[in-house]
Amino acid sequence: MMGSENDEESHLHSSKEEMEKLFLREDGDPLTKSNVNGDKSNSNYRSAMSTLFDSRHPSIVVTPADSDPLFAPPSYYSESRSPRSKPNGGDRVSSYLEPPSYADVIFSPFDDISEINGSEDGHSQSSDSLSRSPSSLSSDYIKITVSNPQKEQEATNSMIPGGSTYITYQITTRTNLSDYGGSEFSVRRRFRDIVTLADRLAESYRGFCIPPRPDKSIVESQVMQKQEFVEQRRVALEKYLRRLVAHPVIRNSDELKVFLQAQGKLPLATSTDVASRMLDGAVKLPKQLFGEGGGASSVEVVQPGRGGRDFLRMFKELRQSVSNDWGGSKPPVVEEDKEFLEKKEKMYDLEQQIINASQQAESLVKAQQDMGETMGELGLAFIKLTKFENEEAVFNSQRARANDMKNLATSAVKASRFYRELNSQTVKHLDTLHDYLGLMMAVQGAFADRSSALLTVQTLLSELSSLEARAEKLEVASSKVFGGDKSRIKKIEELKETIKVTEDSKNVAIREYEQIKENNWSEVERLDRERRADFLNMMKGFVANQVGYAEKIANVWTKVAEETRQYDRESS
């Protein structure tokens, strides 16, 4: 989506970056050791902040930080991070005596955090914060790494060479959880296996807020560069699996353990496509209409009626839904948990507030990006002006002004870099908003499971009442015939059998509904706790970076102001 814009920006800034690099080398500034190719990552900021429900993580060059700075120990020995630090020994000694600046305390340990925590990239820690379980804060751990994508050929014969290829990813799991029966596992999986895992979890854990899986974007796979698309999918899959293992219930599921441990082909039952489900439902429908199928199976009622497997059940639940909304009679059972209904409304309101905050975060990132780019362009413009002044200089005063202009250009370029670093950190911290927007979809799915289970209970109760009324009428009619009506007696026996099956299904459906209610409440309480912690960390990190980089930028311009103070004395 942003490919053409990225190419354009990289072309526009390539010459500027070379000039910037050369200019700073002349000045001997320690920042020449840092990465100056930040514009490529800048082009990804807009995409990262505007894609609200996309599970991909932006390719950001995180320059100084990989973890929450407020929990990092201060370091007083950084030479290249503070504008006050000098390469000579005397100033290094004075740095022990002076109290460190806020920027020194906040940013000096950043480069070492990833090594301490064993993080392999800058994106892993922010993605792990979402759906954090209490056990993740203890000594127990489970770490997922997705790497080494490979193209493989389908086993089936194809007339088109290379026409049936797919990408597999190596998924490595390291854990000390005893339930997994080992400490390290490595398997290869394709995207279809991810879809199967997500479907099995959705069936087995109704009422839970299961993190949404990445979408299979056919369009982007055709438009984007193949290597870029594969890398984005790899990051998205890693982020998804890390969220699953962070869930306190899903992490112990048999489905996830099989997915992470079973070698070879995934032994989970594959997902049935919509066409096959519709065909199965069409085959069963005539038998159900003629009464050969009996009542609803107690095994099937624990799954939602939608999907096409059981047309008759779909029609019955649709009729019940219409009757609930437009009928004059009250349903046999209704949602009476007022506290839950209030919480449900608050969750919907929360989603709207997060959407609004996300839009403002996008605007902030764009403004910071524009500020950094403009400041860099200003510095490069003064570089050219300095070169002109030096070439045309005749008097020493002209050369002095050219030197001051060079210092101004250097400061503008440094400030531009700090804005880029700040923007990178802003994206990392405020990306929590977009993660929670995706999680709101899972919350809605959990609430939909509850509504679907309630509708199934209502439908079965209505059906049971109708069957009992029919059986009672047949018994009354049969009692009026001397000796009994054999055909009616047979129908009564069939109805009683259907009533028994429906009664069992109703009991199973009620138990399923009660279980989903418990799951909903436990998930809502868990999300409330984790949201408070995640949002607090987000705000702490965001504010700390704003303050730290503001001080860095202020120090840059303070140095320029001190060096040019002589002009004030001359004018006075």
UniProtKB/Swiss-Prot annotation:
What topology does it adopt in the membrane?
A: Peripheral membrane protein
Reported function: Plays a role in vesicular protein sorting. Acts at the crossroads between the secretory and endocytic pathways. Is involved in the endosome to vacuole protein transport and, as component of the membrane-associated retromer complex, is also involved in endosome-to-Golgi retrograde transport.
The PTM Phosphoserine maps to: 133
What this protein is called in its record is: Sorting nexin 2B
Q: Where is the composition biased (Polar residues)?
A: 32-53
The Swiss-Prot or TrEMBL note on domains reads: The PX domain binds phosphatidylinositol 3-phosphate which is necessary for peripheral membrane localization.
Expressed, tissue-wise, as follows: Ubiquitously expressed.
Query: Per the record, what phenotype accompanies loss of this gene's function?
Result: Reduced rosette size and inflorescence length as well as root gravitropism defects in snx2a and snx2b double mutant.
Give the subcellular location: Cytoplasm; Endosome membrane; Prevacuolar compartment membrane; Golgi apparatus, trans-Golgi network membrane
Annotated keywords: Cytoplasm, Endosome, Golgi apparatus, Lipid-binding, Membrane, Phosphoprotein, Protein transport, Transport
Keyword Protein transport assigned to the entry: answer is yes
Q: Which family does it belong to?
A: Belongs to the sorting nexin family.
Residue ranges of the region described as Disordered: 1-97, 114-136
- Per its UniProt record, what Pfam families does this chain match? PX (PF00787), Vps5 (PF09325)
Tell me where in this chain the BAR domain is found: 318-572
Q: Which GO terms describe its molecular function?
A: phosphatidylinositol binding; phospholipid binding; protein heterodimerization activity
Bias category Basic and acidic residues: which stretches? Answer: 9-30
- Which positions bind a 1,2-diacyl-sn-glycero-3-phospho-(1D-myo-inositol-3-phosphate)? 190, 216, 233
Name the residue ranges with Low complexity bias: 124-136
Question: What GO cellular component entries does it have?
Answer: cytosol; Golgi apparatus; membrane; multivesicular body membrane; retromer complex
Q: Which organism does this record belong to? A: Arabidopsis thaliana
Ranges where the PX domain occurs:
147-266
User: Oligomeric state and partners?
Assistant: Homodimer. Heterodimer with SNX1 or SNX2B. Component of the retromer complex which consists of VPS29 (MAG1), VPS26 (VPS26A or VPS26B), VPS35 (VPS35A or VPS35B or VPS35C), VPS5/17 (SNX1 or SNX2A or SNX2B).
One GO term of the biological process aspect: protein maturation
